[in-house]
Design a protein with these regions (language model features):
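Cysteine-centered catalytic environments shared across enzyme families
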Residues: 1-153, 158, 438
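Conserved structured core elements
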Residues: 63, 67, 71, 89, ...
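Short, glycine-/Ser/Thr-/acidic-enriched flexible segments
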Residues: 41, 188-190, 445
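Adenosyl-5′-phosphate
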Residues: 23-30, 178, 223-449
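Short helix/loop capping segments that flank catalytic or ligand/cofactor-binding pockets
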Residues: 44-46, 122, 192-194, 307-308, ...
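ATP-dependent adenylate-handling ligase core
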Residues: 117-177, 187-214, 222, 227, ...
Length: 449
Protein backbone atom coordinates (compact mmCIF):
# COMPACT_ATOMS: atom_id res chain seq x y z
CA UNK A 1 0.00 0.00 0.00
CA UNK A 2 1.34 3.42 -0.96
CA UNK A 3 1.30 5.62 2.15
CA UNK A 4 1.56 8.85 0.18
CA UNK A 5 -1.56 7.81 -1.71
CA UNK A 6 -3.45 7.48 1.59
CA UNK A 7 -2.35 10.95 2.66
CA UNK A 8 -3.32 12.49 -0.68
CA UNK A 9 -6.67 10.74 -0.89
CA UNK A 10 -7.67 11.91 2.58
CA UNK A 11 -6.63 15.53 1.97
CA UNK A 12 -7.65 15.96 -1.71
CA UNK A 13 -10.18 13.12 -2.25
CA UNK A 14 -8.13 12.04 -5.26
CA UNK A 15 -4.51 11.22 -6.06
CA UNK A 16 -1.93 13.39 -7.81
CA UNK A 17 0.25 12.83 -10.84
CA UNK A 18 0.58 9.22 -11.97
CA UNK A 19 0.36 7.74 -8.46
CA UNK A 20 -1.89 4.76 -7.69
CA UNK A 21 -2.92 3.22 -4.38
CA UNK A 22 -0.10 0.68 -4.60
CA UNK A 23 3.67 1.02 -4.61
CA UNK A 24 5.54 0.36 -7.87
CA UNK A 25 2.36 0.69 -9.95
CA UNK A 26 1.69 3.95 -11.73
CA UNK A 27 -0.43 5.33 -14.54
CA UNK A 28 0.96 6.03 -17.98
CA UNK A 29 1.70 9.75 -18.13
CA UNK A 30 -0.59 11.79 -20.41
CA UNK A 31 0.92 12.55 -23.80
CA UNK A 32 3.22 9.53 -23.59
CA UNK A 33 3.90 6.29 -25.43
CA UNK A 34 4.89 3.11 -23.61
CA UNK A 35 7.46 1.06 -25.53
CA UNK A 36 8.23 -2.56 -24.69
CA UNK A 37 11.25 -4.13 -26.38
CA UNK A 38 10.60 -7.84 -26.96
CA UNK A 39 14.28 -8.60 -27.52
CA UNK A 40 15.72 -6.99 -24.42
CA UNK A 41 12.63 -7.16 -22.24
CA UNK A 42 13.02 -3.48 -21.43
CA UNK A 43 10.15 -1.07 -20.94
CA UNK A 44 10.31 2.67 -21.45
CA UNK A 45 8.01 5.66 -21.89
CA UNK A 46 8.45 8.54 -24.29
CA UNK A 47 6.59 11.85 -24.26
CA UNK A 48 5.08 12.82 -27.61
CA UNK A 49 3.57 16.12 -26.45
CA UNK A 50 4.13 18.73 -23.76
CA UNK A 51 2.47 21.94 -22.60
CA UNK A 52 5.68 23.66 -23.72
CA UNK A 53 4.60 23.13 -27.32
CA UNK A 54 1.72 25.59 -26.92
CA UNK A 55 2.84 28.96 -28.33
CA UNK A 56 2.18 32.23 -26.53
CA UNK A 57 0.13 34.90 -28.35
CA UNK A 58 0.30 38.01 -26.13
CA UNK A 59 -0.31 40.46 -28.98
CA UNK A 60 -3.67 39.12 -30.17
CA UNK A 61 -6.57 41.46 -29.44
CA UNK A 62 -9.50 40.37 -27.31
CA UNK A 63 -11.94 40.69 -30.23
CA UNK A 64 -9.68 38.57 -32.44
CA UNK A 65 -9.49 35.97 -29.69
CA UNK A 66 -13.29 35.82 -29.46
CA UNK A 67 -13.64 35.36 -33.22
CA UNK A 68 -11.05 32.60 -33.43
CA UNK A 69 -12.20 30.72 -30.34
CA UNK A 70 -15.79 30.80 -31.65
CA UNK A 71 -14.64 29.40 -34.99
CA UNK A 72 -12.59 26.63 -33.39
CA UNK A 73 -15.33 25.68 -30.93
CA UNK A 74 -17.92 25.51 -33.70
CA UNK A 75 -15.62 23.26 -35.74
CA UNK A 76 -14.79 21.06 -32.74
CA UNK A 77 -18.46 20.38 -31.98
CA UNK A 78 -19.47 19.77 -35.58
CA UNK A 79 -16.50 17.48 -36.21
CA UNK A 80 -17.79 15.21 -33.46
CA UNK A 81 -21.45 15.16 -34.44
CA UNK A 82 -21.65 14.80 -38.22
CA UNK A 83 -21.37 11.03 -38.64
CA UNK A 84 -24.18 8.47 -38.65
CA UNK A 85 -24.17 7.81 -34.90
CA UNK A 86 -26.97 9.30 -32.81
CA UNK A 87 -25.60 12.05 -30.54
CA UNK A 88 -26.98 12.96 -27.13
CA UNK A 89 -26.08 15.26 -24.30
CA UNK A 90 -26.15 15.37 -20.52
CA UNK A 91 -27.55 18.85 -19.96
CA UNK A 92 -27.03 20.90 -16.81
CA UNK A 93 -27.83 24.51 -16.03
CA UNK A 94 -24.23 25.50 -16.67
CA UNK A 95 -22.55 26.97 -19.72
CA UNK A 96 -20.56 24.06 -21.15
CA UNK A 97 -23.34 21.66 -22.14
CA UNK A 98 -25.78 24.37 -23.26
CA UNK A 99 -23.14 25.74 -25.64
CA UNK A 100 -22.75 22.34 -27.31
CA UNK A 101 -26.53 21.98 -27.54
CA UNK A 102 -26.87 25.42 -29.09
CA UNK A 103 -24.17 24.89 -31.71
CA UNK A 104 -24.85 21.32 -32.84
CA UNK A 105 -26.63 21.19 -36.21
CA UNK A 106 -28.67 18.02 -35.70
CA UNK A 107 -32.15 18.56 -34.29
CA UNK A 108 -33.70 17.37 -32.14
CA UNK A 109 -31.17 15.48 -30.06
CA UNK A 110 -31.93 13.81 -26.72
CA UNK A 111 -30.81 15.64 -23.60
CA UNK A 112 -30.70 14.13 -20.11
CA UNK A 113 -30.66 15.89 -16.76
CA UNK A 114 -30.47 14.23 -13.36
CA UNK A 115 -31.07 15.80 -9.98
CA UNK A 116 -33.50 16.75 -7.27
CA UNK A 117 -36.76 18.14 -8.56
CA UNK A 118 -36.22 21.64 -7.20
CA UNK A 119 -32.52 22.00 -7.91
CA UNK A 120 -31.06 24.67 -10.18
CA UNK A 121 -29.68 22.23 -12.73
CA UNK A 122 -33.06 20.58 -13.30
CA UNK A 123 -34.94 23.88 -13.41
CA UNK A 124 -32.62 25.70 -15.83
CA UNK A 125 -31.81 22.67 -17.98
CA UNK A 126 -35.53 22.31 -18.68
CA UNK A 127 -35.63 25.92 -19.88
CA UNK A 128 -32.50 25.45 -22.00
CA UNK A 129 -33.86 22.26 -23.56
CA UNK A 130 -37.14 23.96 -24.42
CA UNK A 131 -35.38 26.94 -25.98
CA UNK A 132 -33.10 24.67 -28.03
CA UNK A 133 -35.86 22.22 -28.99
CA UNK A 134 -34.22 19.08 -27.61
CA UNK A 135 -35.94 15.81 -26.67
CA UNK A 136 -35.49 16.27 -22.93
CA UNK A 137 -35.49 13.62 -20.20
CA UNK A 138 -35.22 14.20 -16.46
CA UNK A 139 -34.11 11.61 -13.88
CA UNK A 140 -34.92 12.30 -10.25
CA UNK A 141 -32.49 11.59 -7.39
CA UNK A 142 -34.98 11.83 -4.50
CA UNK A 143 -33.03 9.73 -2.01
CA UNK A 144 -29.82 7.77 -1.61
CA UNK A 145 -31.13 4.40 -2.77
CA UNK A 146 -29.64 4.94 -6.23
CA UNK A 147 -26.19 5.13 -4.62
CA UNK A 148 -26.60 1.71 -3.00
CA UNK A 149 -27.89 0.25 -6.27
CA UNK A 150 -24.88 1.51 -8.25
CA UNK A 151 -22.05 1.63 -5.73
CA UNK A 152 -20.42 -1.64 -6.82
CA UNK A 153 -20.53 -0.69 -10.50
CA UNK A 154 -19.05 2.72 -9.72
CA UNK A 155 -16.23 1.14 -7.72
CA UNK A 156 -15.46 -1.35 -10.50
CA UNK A 157 -15.37 1.35 -13.18
CA UNK A 158 -13.33 3.92 -11.23
CA UNK A 159 -11.21 1.55 -9.11
CA UNK A 160 -11.66 3.70 -6.02
CA UNK A 161 -10.06 6.82 -7.49
CA UNK A 162 -13.48 8.49 -7.54
CA UNK A 163 -15.39 8.59 -4.26
CA UNK A 164 -19.05 7.57 -4.24
CA UNK A 165 -20.09 11.20 -3.64
CA UNK A 166 -19.21 11.79 -7.30
CA UNK A 167 -21.28 8.92 -8.71
CA UNK A 168 -24.14 11.12 -9.95
CA UNK A 169 -25.15 10.23 -13.48
CA UNK A 170 -24.32 6.55 -13.23
CA UNK A 171 -27.94 5.65 -12.46
CA UNK A 172 -29.02 7.12 -15.81
CA UNK A 173 -26.64 5.22 -18.07
CA UNK A 174 -28.96 2.34 -19.01
CA UNK A 175 -31.53 4.89 -20.18
CA UNK A 176 -28.86 6.95 -21.93
CA UNK A 177 -27.82 3.87 -23.91
CA UNK A 178 -31.35 3.65 -25.32
CA UNK A 179 -31.38 7.31 -26.33
CA UNK A 180 -27.94 7.90 -27.83
CA UNK A 181 -24.92 6.24 -29.39
CA UNK A 182 -22.54 9.09 -28.62
CA UNK A 183 -22.44 11.47 -25.67
CA UNK A 184 -21.10 14.90 -26.57
CA UNK A 185 -19.85 15.78 -23.12
CA UNK A 186 -19.39 19.27 -21.77
CA UNK A 187 -16.51 18.00 -19.64
CA UNK A 188 -13.57 20.37 -19.83
CA UNK A 189 -15.56 23.36 -21.04
CA UNK A 190 -14.74 25.48 -18.04
CA UNK A 191 -11.13 24.33 -18.06
CA UNK A 192 -10.58 25.25 -21.70
CA UNK A 193 -12.86 28.24 -22.24
CA UNK A 194 -12.26 29.85 -18.88
CA UNK A 195 -12.90 28.45 -15.44
CA UNK A 196 -14.05 30.40 -12.40
CA UNK A 197 -10.94 29.24 -10.54
CA UNK A 198 -8.65 31.41 -12.71
CA UNK A 199 -7.75 34.10 -10.19
CA UNK A 200 -4.88 36.56 -9.69
CA UNK A 201 -3.51 34.65 -6.68
CA UNK A 202 -2.89 31.73 -9.03
CA UNK A 203 -1.97 33.22 -12.40
CA UNK A 204 0.10 36.09 -10.96
CA UNK A 205 1.16 34.81 -7.54
CA UNK A 206 3.89 36.93 -5.97
CA UNK A 207 6.21 33.94 -5.77
CA UNK A 208 6.27 30.14 -5.84
CA UNK A 209 5.68 29.80 -2.09
CA UNK A 210 2.54 31.94 -2.30
CA UNK A 211 1.25 29.86 -5.20
CA UNK A 212 1.98 26.57 -3.45
CA UNK A 213 0.27 27.37 -0.15
CA UNK A 214 -2.81 28.93 -1.76
CA UNK A 215 -3.10 26.13 -4.31
CA UNK A 216 -2.84 23.48 -1.59
CA UNK A 217 -5.67 25.17 0.29
CA UNK A 218 -7.81 25.18 -2.85
CA UNK A 219 -7.21 21.49 -3.53
CA UNK A 220 -7.92 20.64 0.10
CA UNK A 221 -10.97 22.82 0.75
CA UNK A 222 -12.46 24.36 -2.41
CA UNK A 223 -12.26 22.32 -5.61
CA UNK A 224 -14.54 19.63 -4.25
CA UNK A 225 -16.13 19.02 -0.83
CA UNK A 226 -13.93 20.35 2.04
CA UNK A 227 -11.64 17.56 3.20
CA UNK A 228 -9.64 16.76 6.33
CA UNK A 229 -7.78 19.78 7.73
CA UNK A 230 -4.28 19.86 9.19
CA UNK A 231 -5.64 19.73 12.75
CA UNK A 232 -7.94 16.83 11.93
CA UNK A 233 -5.09 14.99 10.23
CA UNK A 234 -3.26 14.82 13.57
CA UNK A 235 -6.14 12.76 14.99
CA UNK A 236 -6.93 10.79 11.90
CA UNK A 237 -4.44 7.91 11.82
CA UNK A 238 -3.43 5.15 14.18
CA UNK A 239 0.15 4.93 15.38
CA UNK A 240 2.74 4.30 14.07
CA UNK A 241 1.26 5.53 10.76
CA UNK A 242 0.24 8.85 12.28
CA UNK A 243 3.82 10.11 12.49
CA UNK A 244 4.65 8.86 8.99
CA UNK A 245 1.56 10.30 7.28
CA UNK A 246 1.33 13.67 8.98
CA UNK A 247 2.30 16.41 6.51
CA UNK A 248 2.92 13.92 3.71
CA UNK A 249 0.08 15.26 1.56
CA UNK A 250 1.55 18.77 1.57
CA UNK A 251 5.09 17.54 0.92
CA UNK A 252 3.95 15.40 -2.01
CA UNK A 253 1.85 18.29 -3.33
CA UNK A 254 4.92 20.54 -3.41
CA UNK A 255 6.93 17.82 -5.12
CA UNK A 256 4.23 17.27 -7.75
CA UNK A 257 3.86 21.01 -8.38
CA UNK A 258 7.58 21.72 -8.72
CA UNK A 259 7.98 20.77 -12.44
CA UNK A 260 5.11 23.09 -13.36
CA UNK A 261 6.95 26.12 -11.99
CA UNK A 262 8.93 26.27 -15.24
CA UNK A 263 5.84 26.82 -17.39
CA UNK A 264 4.52 30.25 -18.37
CA UNK A 265 3.59 32.02 -15.15
CA UNK A 266 -0.06 32.75 -15.99
CA UNK A 267 -0.98 29.21 -17.03
CA UNK A 268 1.20 26.92 -14.92
CA UNK A 269 -1.49 26.63 -12.24
CA UNK A 270 -4.05 25.67 -14.90
CA UNK A 271 -1.78 22.98 -16.30
CA UNK A 272 -1.30 21.54 -12.83
CA UNK A 273 -5.05 21.69 -12.19
CA UNK A 274 -5.72 19.92 -15.48
CA UNK A 275 -3.32 17.05 -14.73
CA UNK A 276 -4.14 16.72 -11.05
CA UNK A 277 -7.81 17.57 -10.66
CA UNK A 278 -9.45 17.17 -14.06
CA UNK A 279 -7.45 14.07 -15.05
CA UNK A 280 -7.35 12.39 -11.63
CA UNK A 281 -10.87 13.26 -10.41
CA UNK A 282 -13.43 14.57 -12.88
CA UNK A 283 -12.30 12.46 -15.86
CA UNK A 284 -13.83 9.54 -13.98
CA UNK A 285 -17.26 10.85 -15.03
CA UNK A 286 -16.19 10.26 -18.63
CA UNK A 287 -14.71 6.89 -17.75
CA UNK A 288 -17.83 5.44 -16.18
CA UNK A 289 -20.09 6.92 -18.88
CA UNK A 290 -17.99 5.07 -21.47
CA UNK A 291 -19.20 1.81 -19.95
CA UNK A 292 -22.50 2.42 -21.78
CA UNK A 293 -21.98 4.92 -24.61
CA UNK A 294 -19.14 6.39 -26.61
CA UNK A 295 -18.04 9.75 -25.23
CA UNK A 296 -16.66 12.55 -27.38
CA UNK A 297 -15.06 15.62 -25.83
CA UNK A 298 -15.38 18.75 -28.02
CA UNK A 299 -13.66 21.10 -25.60
CA UNK A 300 -10.45 19.07 -25.66
CA UNK A 301 -10.12 19.43 -29.40
CA UNK A 302 -6.37 19.87 -29.97
CA UNK A 303 -6.64 23.09 -31.97
CA UNK A 304 -9.12 24.68 -29.58
CA UNK A 305 -7.12 23.72 -26.48
CA UNK A 306 -3.84 25.00 -27.91
CA UNK A 307 -5.36 28.30 -29.04
CA UNK A 308 -7.17 29.01 -25.77
CA UNK A 309 -4.02 28.37 -23.74
CA UNK A 310 -1.90 30.50 -26.05
CA UNK A 311 -3.92 33.49 -24.86
CA UNK A 312 -3.13 35.54 -21.74
CA UNK A 313 -4.95 33.96 -18.79
CA UNK A 314 -6.77 37.23 -18.12
CA UNK A 315 -8.76 36.68 -21.33
CA UNK A 316 -10.35 33.54 -19.92
CA UNK A 317 -10.87 34.39 -16.25
CA UNK A 318 -14.48 34.57 -15.01
CA UNK A 319 -15.78 33.40 -18.42
CA UNK A 320 -14.55 36.70 -19.89
CA UNK A 321 -14.08 35.18 -23.34
CA UNK A 322 -16.68 32.42 -23.00
CA UNK A 323 -19.66 34.75 -22.64
CA UNK A 324 -18.89 36.75 -25.83
CA UNK A 325 -18.51 33.46 -27.70
CA UNK A 326 -21.92 32.35 -26.44
CA UNK A 327 -23.44 35.74 -27.27
CA UNK A 328 -22.12 35.46 -30.80
CA UNK A 329 -23.11 31.85 -31.46
CA UNK A 330 -26.11 31.07 -29.24
CA UNK A 331 -27.64 34.43 -28.17
CA UNK A 332 -30.99 32.83 -27.33
CA UNK A 333 -29.43 30.62 -24.65
CA UNK A 334 -27.68 33.56 -22.96
CA UNK A 335 -31.13 34.73 -21.87
CA UNK A 336 -31.40 31.78 -19.47
CA UNK A 337 -29.55 32.15 -16.14
CA UNK A 338 -26.38 30.28 -15.30
CA UNK A 339 -27.09 27.86 -12.45
CA UNK A 340 -23.94 28.78 -10.50
CA UNK A 341 -25.04 32.32 -9.59
CA UNK A 342 -28.40 32.52 -11.41
CA UNK A 343 -27.20 35.53 -13.41
CA UNK A 344 -27.53 35.82 -17.19
CA UNK A 345 -24.41 34.84 -19.18
CA UNK A 346 -25.04 37.68 -21.64
CA UNK A 347 -22.53 40.36 -22.63
CA UNK A 348 -25.24 43.03 -22.58
CA UNK A 349 -24.09 44.90 -19.49
CA UNK A 350 -27.41 46.64 -18.87
CA UNK A 351 -29.47 43.45 -19.18
CA UNK A 352 -27.02 41.43 -17.08
CA UNK A 353 -26.72 43.99 -14.27
CA UNK A 354 -30.46 44.70 -14.15
CA UNK A 355 -31.28 41.00 -13.96
CA UNK A 356 -28.56 40.41 -11.33
CA UNK A 357 -29.95 43.23 -9.20
CA UNK A 358 -33.41 41.68 -9.29
CA UNK A 359 -32.03 38.27 -8.32
CA UNK A 360 -30.19 39.77 -5.35
CA UNK A 361 -33.21 41.79 -4.22
CA UNK A 362 -35.45 38.71 -4.29
CA UNK A 363 -32.94 36.75 -2.24
CA UNK A 364 -32.74 39.52 0.36
CA UNK A 365 -36.51 39.86 0.51
CA UNK A 366 -36.85 36.10 1.07
CA UNK A 367 -34.19 36.16 3.75
CA UNK A 368 -35.22 39.26 5.68
CA UNK A 369 -38.91 39.92 4.98
CA UNK A 370 -41.01 37.06 3.66
CA UNK A 371 -40.11 33.98 1.63
CA UNK A 372 -42.34 34.42 -1.42
CA UNK A 373 -39.94 34.08 -4.38
CA UNK A 374 -38.96 30.55 -5.48
CA UNK A 375 -35.42 29.45 -4.71
CA UNK A 376 -33.80 26.29 -6.03
CA UNK A 377 -31.32 23.91 -4.42
CA UNK A 378 -27.73 24.45 -5.54
CA UNK A 379 -27.00 20.71 -5.27
CA UNK A 380 -28.46 18.18 -7.68
CA UNK A 381 -27.71 15.24 -5.36
CA UNK A 382 -28.14 15.61 -1.59
CA UNK A 383 -25.28 13.36 -0.54
CA UNK A 384 -25.10 14.96 2.89
CA UNK A 385 -28.60 13.86 3.84
CA UNK A 386 -28.28 10.56 1.97
CA UNK A 387 -25.52 9.71 4.45
CA UNK A 388 -27.71 10.72 7.39
CA UNK A 389 -30.66 8.66 6.18
CA UNK A 390 -30.66 5.85 3.57
CA UNK A 391 -26.87 5.35 3.57
CA UNK A 392 -26.20 5.60 7.29
CA UNK A 393 -26.39 1.90 8.16
CA UNK A 394 -24.28 0.95 5.12
CA UNK A 395 -21.65 3.60 5.90
CA UNK A 396 -21.36 2.78 9.59
CA UNK A 397 -21.07 -0.92 8.81
CA UNK A 398 -17.91 -0.13 6.81
CA UNK A 399 -16.45 2.61 9.03
CA UNK A 400 -16.92 0.73 12.31
CA UNK A 401 -16.19 -2.75 10.98
CA UNK A 402 -13.48 -4.84 12.64
CA UNK A 403 -11.68 -5.27 9.31
CA UNK A 404 -11.38 -1.50 8.92
CA UNK A 405 -9.89 -1.09 12.41
CA UNK A 406 -7.50 -4.03 12.05
CA UNK A 407 -5.78 -2.43 9.08
CA UNK A 408 -4.31 0.00 11.64
CA UNK A 409 -4.69 2.96 9.28
CA UNK A 410 -7.58 5.15 10.47
CA UNK A 411 -8.18 5.86 14.15
CA UNK A 412 -11.57 4.23 15.03
CA UNK A 413 -12.48 6.83 17.65
CA UNK A 414 -11.94 9.66 15.18
CA UNK A 415 -14.07 7.92 12.54
CA UNK A 416 -16.88 7.94 15.09
CA UNK A 417 -16.23 11.61 15.83
CA UNK A 418 -16.52 12.49 12.14
CA UNK A 419 -19.78 10.59 11.80
CA UNK A 420 -21.22 12.19 14.96
CA UNK A 421 -20.36 15.62 13.60
CA UNK A 422 -22.07 14.80 10.35
CA UNK A 423 -25.21 13.44 11.98
CA UNK A 424 -25.46 16.46 14.28
CA UNK A 425 -26.05 18.79 11.29
CA UNK A 426 -24.02 21.43 13.12
CA UNK A 427 -21.56 21.77 10.21
CA UNK A 428 -22.33 22.50 6.57
CA UNK A 429 -19.94 20.16 4.79
CA UNK A 430 -18.49 17.14 6.55
CA UNK A 431 -19.17 14.54 3.90
CA UNK A 432 -15.88 15.22 2.11
CA UNK A 433 -14.09 14.09 5.26
CA UNK A 434 -16.02 10.81 5.50
CA UNK A 435 -16.90 9.55 2.02
CA UNK A 436 -13.28 9.05 0.81
CA UNK A 437 -12.58 6.86 3.86
CA UNK A 438 -15.51 4.62 2.97
CA UNK A 439 -14.41 4.44 -0.66
CA UNK A 440 -10.82 3.69 0.32
CA UNK A 441 -11.87 0.78 2.54
CA UNK A 442 -14.16 -0.53 -0.22
CA UNK A 443 -11.24 -0.31 -2.66
CA UNK A 444 -8.99 -2.32 -0.35
CA UNK A 445 -11.60 -5.03 0.08
CA UNK A 446 -12.16 -5.28 -3.67
CA UNK A 447 -8.63 -4.96 -5.06
CA UNK A 448 -6.22 -5.62 -2.20
CA UNK A 449 -7.69 -8.25 0.11
Amino acid sequence: IDLTAIAQYVRFQHLLGVRTFFEDIQLLSPGSILIYDLTSGSCDTRAYWSFNEIPYAPTISFDEAVEESARLLDRAIKRRSKDDYAPGLFLSGGLDSRTILGIIDRRPIPTLTYGLQNCRDVYYAKKIAKAAGSDHHWFDLPNGNWVLENIDLHLDLTEGYHSWIHAHGISTLSSARQLMDVNLTGWGGGMVMGKRFIEPRLYSAVDDAALTTHFFYKFNQKYTWPAITEAEERLHYQQPLNDRLRGLAYDSFREELEPYMDFRHDVKSEYFYLRNHEWRLTLNFVNFTRSHVEVRVPYYDYDLFDFMHSLPAEFRMQQRIFRPVMQKMIPKLTKIPYEYDEFLPTTNTYVRSTHATMVKLKRRFNRHVWEIFPEYFTLYADYQNYLRDELREWAEHILYDRRTAEREIFEPSFLKTLMKRHLSRMEDATIGKIAPLITYEMMLRRFYD
